């Protein structure tokens, strides 16, 4: 299974982190105040849009200062007990706690829901109050009223969206290391759609590169759409598979800006990666199949049926796993994969282009539409091509791809052995063996 590039090329040190110089300086001063025994703040909150490097900065900081990183996802209430446990141990001296140098990282604190995760915020506040170790929290949007007490207890550090030039340097460096041909205009288009999200840029670059083998403007325009500021396909998958409640799974699908059919392909690719039980996989695919049926009906009958699509594609897949009902269940962390259909597009795009140009050439010669050429003219031309291939090729100036397509139609127009036998019976009926007397 190929490693996701955003993990493969994640900065290993603060020096490698692009476009966040002020933030890096603030973090260095803060951690050094801890190391000198006079911390300026017990905890910092790194906040900013997805993909700007919040978690990466925390990891790079720990690596640069040779500190162990203890990481938890604050938005997962299954970690509430862990947070409380860490809060207690963090108040004990380093020699009892284990390795002396540590940073505690709590990711996605804005994912805490006050009613569903009751007790999480008090537990984090207790951790900050008692800790003998530096604490880093991250959030996309820390301004929810329920997080006010946390904001008052930490040093707030904002990360800005990444600019065009740092992102372009990053993408070009990856293309060079992966030995991939990339066109500047194509990279510009990816960046324009990304809303400054480096992870989104890298994910899109990898999908196109693995599918097409090169990154051109046409390929990018075909596959890359403007990123929603809140959700991308990877986050949608994670939010569905990790959902604890029906509404969480449905909201994840409803809020996603990914095309419905494309999102189904994402689930199709990743269901067997997330679920290990064959029964769970079967139930998830059953829900996905029914969602596909309802989507087809919604297009034909009315979009009121779209709610059923969301129910099946969100909660239907999320709760297909019976393992979730077991006490202490925790979803597996999975490196989600791009849909194989992207690779299929790469393989078929050249053929589709050849069909288009062939129909256009014939249409120009016969002054008819491409649809009429496909339905009426092409079958006759294919039959003629079997006897006069060179004349047709010269007249239409066919490319190798167009010749291949015409050969496919030629084979399709040939009668099968059954059809030949039926035709023989029709025109040469079997003589009766009986004789007149």
Swiss-Prot record:
Stretches of Basic and acidic residues bias are at 416-425
Keywords, comma-separated and alphabetical: ATP-binding, DNA replication, Nucleotide-binding
Q: Which SMART domains match?
A: AAA
Task: Please give the start and end residues of each transmembrane region.
Answer: none
Which Pfam family, any one of them, does this sequence belong to?
A: AAA
SUPFAM superfamilies the record matches:
P-loop containing nucleoside triphosphate hydrolases (SSF52540)
Q: Name the domain of life.
A: Archaea
Renumbered to this chain, the Basic residues biased-composition regions fall at 426-437
Keyword flag Repressor: no
Q: Where is this region: Disordered?
A: 410-437
For this UniProt entry, the molecular function terms from Gene Ontology, in alphabetical order, are:
ATP binding; ATP hydrolysis activity; DNA clamp loader activity
As for what it does, the entry says: Part of the RFC clamp loader complex which loads the PCNA sliding clamp onto DNA.
Subunit and interaction comment: Heteromultimer composed of small subunits (RfcS) and large subunits (RfcL).
Similarity annotation: Belongs to the activator 1 small subunits family. RfcL subfamily.
Under what name is this protein listed? Answer: Replication factor C large subunit
Underlying gene: rfcL
């Amino acid at each position: 299974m190929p490693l996701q590039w955003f993990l493969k090329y994640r900065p290993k040190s603060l020096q490698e982190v692009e476009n966040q110089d002020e933030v890096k300086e603030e973090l260095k001063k803060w951690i050094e105040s801890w190391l000198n025994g006079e911390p300026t703040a017990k905890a910092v909150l790194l906040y900013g849009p997805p993909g700007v490097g919040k978690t990466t900065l925390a990891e790079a900081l720990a690596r640069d200062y040779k500190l162990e990183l203890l990481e938890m996802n604050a938005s997962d209430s299954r970690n509430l007990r862990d947070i409380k446990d860490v809060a207690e141990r963090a108040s004990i001296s380093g020699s009892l706690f284990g390795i002396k140098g540590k940073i505690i990282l709590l990711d996605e604190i804005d994912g805490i829901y006050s009613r569903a995760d009751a007790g999480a915020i008090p537990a984090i506040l207790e951790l900050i109050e008692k800790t003998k170790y530096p604490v880093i929290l991250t959030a996309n949007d820390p301004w929810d009223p329920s997080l006010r007490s946390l904001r008052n207890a930490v040093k707030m550090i904002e990360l800005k969206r990444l600019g065009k030039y740092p992102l372009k340097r990053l993408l070009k460096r990856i293309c060079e290391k992966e030995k991939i041909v990339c066109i500047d205009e194509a990279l510009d288009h990816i960046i324009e759609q990304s809303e400054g999200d480096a992870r989104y840029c890298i994910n899109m670059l990898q999908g196109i590169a693995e599918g097409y083998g090169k990154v051109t403007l046409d390929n990018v325009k075909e596959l890359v759409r403007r990123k929603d500021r809140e959700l991308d396909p990877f986050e949608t998958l994670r939010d569905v598979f990790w959902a604890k409640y029906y509404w969480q799974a449905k909201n994840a699908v409803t809020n996603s800006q990914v095309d419905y059919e494309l999102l189904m392909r994402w689930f199709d690719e990743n269901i067997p990666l997330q679920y290990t039980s064959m029964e769970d996989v079967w139930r998830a695919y059953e829900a996905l199949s029914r969602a596909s049926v309802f989507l087809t009906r919604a297009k034909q009958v009315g979009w009121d049926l779209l709610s059923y699509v969301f129910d099946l594609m969100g909660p239907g897949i999320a709760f297909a796993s019976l393992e979730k009902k077991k006490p202490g269940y925790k979803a597996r962390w999975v490196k989600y994969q791009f849909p194989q259909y992207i690779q299929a597009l790469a393989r078929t795009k050249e053929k589709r282009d050849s069909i288009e140009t062939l129909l256009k050439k014939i249409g120009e010669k016969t002054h008819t539409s491409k649809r009429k050429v496909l339905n009426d003219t092409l079958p006759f031309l294919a039959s003629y091509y079997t006897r006069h291939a060179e004349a047709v090729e010269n007249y239409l100036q066919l490319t190798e791809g167009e010749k291949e397509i015409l050969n496919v139609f030629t084979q399709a127009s040939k009668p099968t052995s059954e059809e030949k036998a039926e035709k023989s019976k029709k025109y040469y009926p079997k003589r009766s063996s009986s004789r007149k007397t």
